[in-house]
Amino acid sequence: MNEKSFTVKNPSHEQNKRVFIDGSERNVAELPSMYIGKGVYRPGWRWSKHAGLQTGKESTRHIGYIVSGSTVIQDASGQETTVGLGDAFEIGPNHDGWVVGDEPCVALDFETR
């Protein structure tokens, strides 16, 4: 038996895409052990306004990495921090986030299966 020992996918080319009401989008690559999402969020995009409202869901825990741009994340207690280029982050459920500045925020997020 000769099973391949690797899986290669590019989230930018995957069919699992969500386009938000402002035109921002998130694609997901499904790997055997995890999901990797790539989001391109336009200036002014906000989770509660453009994702939560559209999906009817609460925000969940996110582990991610900012490829470009920046976003403010606000935790459930109201504390805020800005994450930007090169920052890795983890935030718990029931948070909000919004893009700051004139540049789209490109972020990767990781979720185990």
Which sequence ranges carry the predicted segments?
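Surface-exposed loop/turn positions
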Residues: P32, W45, D87, P93-H95, ...
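Conserved GNAT-family N-acetyltransferase fold
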Residues: G39-Y41, G64, F89
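Short beta-strand segments in beta-sandwich/barrel cores
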Residues: R46, G69-Q74, G97
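Short, conserved beta-strand element in jelly-roll/cupin
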Residues: T55-I73
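Short acidic-glycine-tyrosine-enriched beta hairpin
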Residues: D75-N94
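Ligand-binding loop in jelly-roll beta-barrel domains
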Residues: G92-R113
